[in-house]
Design a protein with these regions (language model features):
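Motif-centric detector for short Cys/His coordination patterns
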Residues: 1-104
Length: 104
């Protein structure tokens, strides 16, 4: 019998077993290109994030990588977003859109 109160989280598992971290990020056309240390690129629309969507471009461009590559921080907007959250949203959107997900 398992007496642990911990539950398995596949997103956390992927991040830690693969050692995923944010290597860099760029902003263009109201989207963030988030480059991971395995060269995977996540394209994130700012419309999904209230503080970023309505912010002036100068403030959107003022961010830094935090937590040893686990997130992004916008000091002037008081906004923090995580790699975990980006991946969670990616999986959620792809499942909701009923896209073909290939397991190879």
């Amino acid at each position: 019998m398992n007496t642990s109160n911990k539950s398995y989280d596949p997103i956390t598992d992927i991040i830690f077993t693969k050692g995923l971290k944010i290597k860099s990020a760029t902003h263009k056309d109201r989207k963030l290109d988030i480059i991971l240390n395995n060269d995977l690129i996540l394209v994130v629309s700012l419309k999904n994030y209230k503080k970023l969507n309505g912010a002036p471009l100068e403030e959107v461009n003022n961010f830094k990588i935090i937590g040893n590559g686990t997130g992004l921080h916008w000091p002037t907007l008081d906004e923090d977003l995580s790699l975990y959250g980006f991946l969670k949203e990616f999986f959620k959107q792809n499942i909701e859109k009923k896209r073909k997900l290939v397991i190879a």
